[in-house]
Structures are given as structure tokens and as C-alpha cells.
């Protein structure tokens, strides 16, 4: 249940309107949370190659969403980078 409550709080803090659950901003925030969790898992389980592959897919998907956000809404892109402590 902890993951679900974290996810709901994250969606509430990044959503653009009342029913927003799938905008690029929310997707980037959720992917960042999953990436952090999976990175911690992989530090303890170095031989978990399937999780490493999943991590690489998530990082690539987040990168593409951030590129889209930068292309369409540069202000929100910069805000996302600062709020999530991402470097670009």
C-alpha cells in the first residue's frame, strides 16, 4: 500500500488539472520514482539482469518524454528538471 499512496501523492503534486493522471509531466514524475526505487533494488541485487533491462527501458522512456516536453513546453520542462532534481 505504501507504493500506491506515494503514487497518489506524486500525481496530486504534479497534475495539471483535477483529473490529470497521464500527462507527460505526471508520467515523468512517476517514471522518476520507479527509476529511483529500481536503482536501489539493483544496488543490492547486482545479478538481476531482467530488472536492469527494465530500468534501461524506463530511463529511455523518461528521456523521450522529457524531449517531448522540452519541444512543446520548455517552461514546464525546466520546472520538471528542478523539481525532480534531474540534470540535462
From Swiss-Prot:
Record keyword Cell wall biogenesis/degradation present: no
Origin, by domain of life?
Bacteria
Disulphide-bridged cysteine pairs? none
Subunit structure, as described in the record: Part of the 30S ribosomal subunit. Forms a bridge to the 50S subunit in the 70S ribosome, contacting the 23S rRNA.
Would the keyword RNA-binding turn up in this protein's UniProt record? yes
Q: GO CC: one term?
A: cytoplasm
Gene3D superfamilies named in the record: 6.10.250.3130, S15/NS1, RNA-binding
- The organism named in the record is Methylacidiphilum infernorum (isolate V4)
Give the source lineage, highest ranks first.
Bacteria, Pseudomonadati, Verrucomicrobiota, Methylacidiphilae, Methylacidiphilales
Report the protein's function.
Answer: One of the primary rRNA binding proteins, it binds directly to 16S rRNA where it helps nucleate assembly of the platform of the 30S subunit by binding and bridging several RNA helices of the 16S rRNA.
Which BP terms from GO are recorded?
A: translation
Keywords assigned: Ribonucleoprotein, Ribosomal protein, RNA-binding, rRNA-binding
Q: What is this protein called?
A: Small ribosomal subunit protein uS15
Would you identify the family this protein belongs to, as annotated?
Belongs to the universal ribosomal protein uS15 family.
Q: Which PANTHER family match?
A: RIBOSOMAL PROTEIN S15, BACTERIAL AND ORGANELLAR, SMALL RIBOSOMAL SUBUNIT PROTEIN US15M
Write out the GO MF terms.
rRNA binding; structural constituent of ribosome
